[in-house]
Design a protein with these regions (language model features):
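Peptidyl-prolyl cis-trans isomerase
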Residues: 37-46, 52-53, 95-97, 148-150, ...
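Proteins synthesized as precursors that undergo proteolytic processing into mature forms
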Residues: 240, 480-484, 701
């Protein structure tokens, strides 16, 4: 293969020097021919198949401004095989399928172009980090992507992909001391090399105030930016604290007050820190007057924001606010340490920014040491300095589409490679299944239809409490707006409690709450210090019973109306939302949630505070689930909840989870939604499913894994890996949350508009005549077994997993039954499922994109 590989490298050198379009196309076609020859020496999907074969899931990678990361989860008993596979992957890699992957990057680039937010972000960061690599979008400039050099990629790999510039981060249920020798045995063979000196960039000048304007956004937006600090700087944590004085998750910051006072639609502060440099950002969206359907000016928005920023610069900082923010830091750190994935992120940051792990673990101690003088000094030093202001107006950005050459698919060899046999010969540990033990959940009932579940928290003293009412927007369409009002309202009374005061009172107790709604449920989520559970619950209950939706000049409800009006207008220009609405129309017809929701002019803009308060009170007449996770004894918790919550003794039974009526698919049908502005077309495939039966759960899983299971599934393999037609492609059957509810097959391909016909041909060939690879079943059994065994909730979600299982009729962890069924799986199960539920079934196809291509 080596001569072919060297030829591919040389051809890319030629392509980079060729400017004539016809000549370039000829070179690309020649690259494709040689790449197809080289593809015979190794399967492009072998790595993903090997990961699947050891039970690995979530195979992916990402590139940020400062680091590239490769990751997946896997069972610890396969540790040696996983270490061997990854270490071998990094030893003399051959980039034979470079052209195919580059095509996928083109698709990714074009996909981002259809989102105005991409253009806004690129414009702002291009100015904020001018002169630095941070000014460039991560995916790169179009010219770089059009003229890639494989030789430069290989040089980059040889320079930076060395063990002295690399971290291996493992978090999970394994023995550290027995794993260390395995790491030495596998990764120890990688050769260190001296690293070149990193490019030193000058700091972007912030010598005077500067102002920029651009018509790129979905709505007007103000961005104010100051020069900040790099990660690890002595002022980094204090600047983070200053940002939280402006906005935070408790909604008690100075900018939060502006939104709660209905002066702004949205405002947030953030400390953007990176390896070399950083910026301090304030983002605000103007208030929209629902009566005139106009935003307040960006000038007025800037005046409001800068008045609050100036308070910090002048040292006008409320000591009480400082202590509330400090307590919130403590809570958020403790919550972070609850989850393995967050520990991965912590270690990832420690490596990327060369920070001692011990220092990161001392965050609470370091936050405790921040003084008022520190805050005043840092606020004045950074926020009192020159700034860059960005006025983003509504507009349509120019899109520089990347053209793709017409290339033929790569056909890789099938069957087991020698490497696969080698990996299989490495001894694996023994799988010891563990299942979810629900016995520690205290289950009780206050009244018929009012259930309470208490789960112990042994990690910290932060409780979480969810009130889940059995009604949502499907039955009460205005409930969406009542929930929005609850998140911005205070409490009735004489004199009553204003919205900001209500949030501050909760924060003093270490508490916070939020309200949300779905098709079928209304949620009240409460969190806080365990010692103040009773007071926090009492305060939230008071808010639930006596919310104050009235305001001077109806500013509060007009704010909500303005948000809805603005959101509806954004929907018309956001291709992702338009596609979602089109999909729902194809699926549900006149029952689409976009059609059934309250009409903007006739209903939303006519809403009254009393009307929405009435809707909110209807919620409390429905079936209720109470989910508590905390450290207090269940008996004490139930006593607090029973006495402090206003519970209805006679509730209406829930009809949720909602099953929205669908449009039956009785014949093949294609829907077109033309949009000439789109760089990438969206293609959906829909097939009606059968009523869900949990006895078929494993068959659904097996088909989904075989047909659409990540990089190893047929869809990604045929459409992305072989043909480079799409960055995103999938296909799966969704399982219903309740026995007997309908399932459905949903497929998707995002591709250039001129590739739509080809992509549909390939996808339809998979649906009409599914390729059969029985040899993949061992991998599928392995990954499904690992998937069901590792699909465990956090302690905070444990009781909700229990009730979800109960809806499906399970009395134990479903994995206990599914592991047995997985062991019996054969390819006949997959084939039978396909023939009964897919083959020959009528299909609806939805195409959204530029019709001219």
């Amino acid at each position: 293969e080596k001569p072919l590989y060297e030829q591919i490298i040389a051809l890319y050198d030629t392509l980079a020097l060729t400017t004539d379009e016809q000549a370039r196309e000829a070179v690309q076609l020649r690259i494709n021919e040689v790449s197809r020859e080289a593809a015979q020496y190794a399967a492009t999907d072998e790595f993903s198949n090997l990961i699947q074969g050891i039970g690995g899931e979530g195979l992916n990678a990402f590139t940020s401004y400062d680091v590239t990361c490769y990751m997946n989860s896997f069972p610890s008993y396969q540790m040696e095989r996983w270490l061997t596979l990854y270490a071998d992957r990094l030893t003399n890699p051959v980039f034979r399928s470079f052209q195919a992957e580059l095509e996928n990057v083109f698709e990714e680039y074009n996909m981002y172009l259809d989102d105005n937010s991409t253009h806004v972000r690129n414009f702002i960061f291009g100015k904020l980090y001018e002169g630095h690599a941070y000014a460039r979008n991560i995916i790169g400039y179009p010219e770089d992507l059009k003229n890639p050099k494989l030789r430069k990629l290989i040089d980059f790999y040889n320079t930076w992909y060395v063990p002295n510039n690399m971290a291996l981060i493992l978090v999970g249920d394994f023995e550290i001391e027995t794993t260390k020798p395995l790491i030495e045995k596998t990764f120890g063979k990688l050769q260190s090399r001296p690293l070149p000196e990193r490019t030193k960039y000058p700091t972007t000048a912030f010598t005077q105030d500067e102002r920029y304007t651009a018509k790129l956004g979905y709505m007007p937006e103000l961005n104010i930016a100051y020069n900040g600090v790099a990660v690890g700087d002595k002022d980094e944590l204090t600047l983070n604290f200053v940002a939280n004085l402006l906005s935070n998750s408790m909604q008690i910051g100075l900018l939060d007050q502006l939104t709660l006072d209905n002066k702004l639609m949205y405002a947030v502060a953030a400390n953007d820190t990176r390896r070399d440099q950083g910026r301090f950002l304030v983002v605000a969206v103007p208030y929209m007057d629902a009566q005139t359907q106009t935003y307040t000016s960006l000038k007025e928005t800037e005046e409001l924001v800068m008045k609050e920023v100036q308070k910090l610069v002048d040292g006008d900082i409320d000591p009480e606010l400082v202590e509330m923010v400090r307590q919130n830091f403590y809570q958020e750190f403790d919550r972070t340490m609850e989850y393995p994935q967050m520990k991965v992120s912590l270690l990832y940051s420690a490596f990327t920014y060369q920070q001692p792990v011990e220092e990161i673990l001392r965050e609470k101690e370091l936050v405790a040491a921040i003084t008022m003088d520190d805050l005043k000094r840092v606020a004045k030093q950074y926020l009192g300095a020159p700034k860059k202001v960005f006025e983003i107006e509504e507009g349509t950005p120019k899109k520089d589409k990347l053209p793709k050459p017409k290339i033929k698919s790569l056909e890789s060899p099938k069957g087991e490679s020698e490497y696969c046999q080698y990996l299989d010969a490495i001894p694996a540990g023994k799988l010891t299944p563990t299942f979810i033990d629900f016995s520690d959940i205290d289950q009780d009932r206050f009244y018929e239809g009012v259930s309470v579940y208490c789960t112990p928290n042994t990690k910290n003293h932060i409780f979480s409490l969810r009130l889940k009412y059995g009604v949502g927007t499907y039955e009460l369409p205005l409930l969406e707006y009542a929930a929005a009002l609850m998140n911005m309202s205070g409490i009735k009374g004489t004199p009553g409690i204003k919205p900001a005061e209500f949030r501050a009172n909760l924060a003093k107790l270490g508490g916070k709450c939020s309200y949300s709604v779905s098709d079928g449920y209304f949620y009240v989520d409460i969190e806080g210090n365990e010692e103040n559970l009773e007071k926090i619950v009492e305060m939230v209950n008071l808010h639930m019973m006596f919310p104050n939706f009235e305001s001077e000049n109806d500013m509060l409800i007009n704010n909500i109306k303005g948000q809805v009006y603005s959101s509806r207008k954004v929907e018309e220009r956001n291709t992702d939302i338009v596609a979602d609405a089109a999909f729902d129309y194809v699926r549900y017809g006149e029952n689409s949630p976009y059609i059934k929701r309250p009409a903007l002019m006739e209903e939303v803009l006519q809403m009254t505070p009393s009307q929405l308060e009435g809707v909110l009170h209807q919620v409390q007449n429905y079936e209720l689930e109470i989910h508590y996770a905390g450290a207090l004894p269940a008996l004490d918790v139930k006593n607090i909840l029973y006495t402090k919550l206003s519970l209805n003794q006679h509730v209406r039974p829930t009809k949720s989870p909602v099953e929205r009526p669908v449009v039956p698919i009785t014949e093949n049908k294609i829907y077109f939604l033309p949009d000439a502005s789109m760089q990438q077309a969206k293609v959906y495939f829909l097939i009606d499913g059968e009523p869900y039966n949990v006895k078929e759960a494993v068959n659904y899983m097996a088909f989904n894994e075989y047909f659409g299971g990540g990089f190893s599934g047929l869809v990604m393999n045929e459409i992305r890996e072989k043909r480079s037609m799409a960055y995103t492609a999938y296909g799966y059957f969704s399982r219903a949350p309740k026995q007997g509810q309908l399932t459905k097959f949903t497929g998707y391909v995002g591709t250039q508009s001129d590739k739509v016909a080809d992509a549909i041909d390939v996808y339809m060939s998979l649906l009409d005549s599914m390729p059969q690879y029985p040899e993949t079943m061992e991998n599928i059994r392995t990954v499904l077994r690992q998937s069901v065994l590792s699909n465990k909730p956090t302690f905070r979600g444990k009781s909700q997993r229990l009730t979800a299982n109960m809806l499906l009729g399970y009395k134990v962890d479903p994995a206990m039954l599914q592991v047995r069924d997985i062991q019996r799986l054969t390819f006949d199960n997959v084939l039978s499922f396909y023939e009964q539920r897919v083959k020959g079934k009528p299909i609806t196809i939805l195409i959204m994109g530029d019709p001219k291509l």
